[in-house]
């Protein structure tokens, strides 16, 4: 279910840190809670259009989510990315006594048309190439649930806690021809920011900063601006904000009361807005334009009343000669540019829109062209109902010739 876009970049919420019931560390209640998990994802706030299905080292949770999607579920989400969360072999410290493992998140560019093959490729050419730790006896023991369980003394959680895959190997793969243009990387901010404590070296912290594309944080909104300010001391990489969800208490979108009514979410939060298409290339735009493409806030960064926004237009050709394709043309709620050569119909399009909306516009030069042609206009607040003649909404229309005349008169 790949989405096509014809309206330019738009602000949408991206939540790129949601663990599944298949994650090694989670509190959903195990794999039997997957139906409830999907229900919760389907009731995410309507502004959330991109999610990252995040699991430690493995892609099984993403694969399970996509099984539901291929059966018609999760139509509320435009794009679902797989994200592998790695613990790296450099430690930060929140205090003198407690070491904190730094998390590296790896998002993969993956299409849905050939899903099985792409998942297989990630398993075989990425995950299975990395040992479970850097010590000699594990050189031939690659990442797998079985190897973590065996080395943990038949205890998966212990193996997961004790063993850290070699970070050098992870970055070696990320920089190889297969993956360097197919991955986007984040560091967990909190643990990374503690690297200078407990005698850790700042050069190592700077090296990690330079290796990744952005940072993730689940910090509370009140402290987020300060965190971004501290991060800016190293460069212009952006924070992305998410709740780091591991259980239903923070994915409480599927809760119901005793009457079966949906209860408003109280704990779920994600404040990351990205202005881009919901694609991998869209995400990469935040590297080059971090200030223009990312906003961390509760409300829509460019909220406008739907009453005042033209959502789409449609030509109606009754001549039987197929002068115009009877297709809907989506319009951006921001700036729209009409591009075309001389006499290609740019002014005609604007005149038709203005005329349909009740503006007195001189279209005598186009009378023959527009014979048996009209245009339908749809507003954002009711995009299924075309505008009628008694609609009171108006626009201000300044034709090109009118502007030229104003300039000449000024001269």
What positions do the PLM features span?
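Short beta-strand-centered segment that lines the nucleotide-binding/catalytic pocket of NTP-utilizing
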Residues: 360-374
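Aromatic-lined carbohydrate-recognition surfaces of secreted/lumenal glycan-active proteins
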Residues: 171-196
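Generic recognition of stable, solvent-exposed alpha-helical segments in well-folded globular domains
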Residues: 278, 308, 330-333, 344-348, ...
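Short, well-ordered loop/turn and helix-capping segments at boundaries between secondary-structure elements
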Residues: 289, 350, 355-359, 403, ...
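Alpha-helix N-cap/helix-start capping residues at coil-to-helix junctions, especially the first residue
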Residues: 79-165, 188
